[in-house]
Swiss-Prot record:
Gene Ontology BP, a term: translation
Gene3D superfamilies the record matches: 3.30.160.20, 3.30.230.10
Native organism: Dehalococcoides mccartyi (strain ATCC BAA-2266 / KCTC 15142 / 195) (Dehalococcoides ethenogenes (strain 195))
Family annotation (PANTHER family): MITOCHONDRIAL RIBOSOMAL PROTEIN S5
Keywords: Ribonucleoprotein, Ribosomal protein, RNA-binding, rRNA-binding
Family: Belongs to the universal ribosomal protein uS5 family.
Transmembrane segments: none
This protein's record includes keyword Ribosomal protein: yes
Signal peptide coordinates: none
InterPro entries recorded: Ribosomal_Su5_D2-typ_SF, Ribosomal_uS5, Ribosomal_uS5_bac-type, Ribosomal_uS5_C, Ribosomal_uS5_N, Ribsml_uS5_D2-typ_fold_subgr
Assembly, per entry: Part of the 30S ribosomal subunit. Contacts proteins S4 and S8.
Domain S5 DRBM span(s) in chain numbering: 15-78
Name of the protein: Small ribosomal subunit protein uS5
Amino acid sequence: MLAKVERIDPSELELNDKLIFINRVTKVVKGGKRMGFAALVVTGDGKNHVGIGVGKAKEVPSAISKASANAKRNLSRILLNGTTVPHEIVFKYGAAQVLLKPAAPGTGIIAGGSVRAVLESTGIKDILTKSMGCSNKANVAKATLGGLTAMRDPKTTVTKRRSSLKEEAAGG
């Protein structure tokens, strides 16, 4: 679902964590109810690196620290065109669908909820977004990250297409 990317060392970056949400979960056992917590954290340096992590624990602080550590393990490098994205993309993760459109300088981040948190952590300043389908914060955040990692440089894509067309003509 999400694109594979090269491993990024988090110790070399100045990362900031943002807590997207905390979920209280209950497990019913013979003796009663067991409470636990799940946290979703996005971490980024504001300079094209971002990661999302989920942590689960009996206490809130340990769930947040586990989520932060998980986000640092899942860092991705994002391709940007100045302060916005290079092209429009619609990405789907589960039932969540996110539309990311480039915007003119000075537009700002037109997004809400977990989409905004991921985009701010990435360092994007101008973008238009639309979240469709389900409103599950984890799936929306993962769809946003998936869309950002699926971005390709238009110039590189054009040169690859031209070279493959030349190979087709020469070989066929």
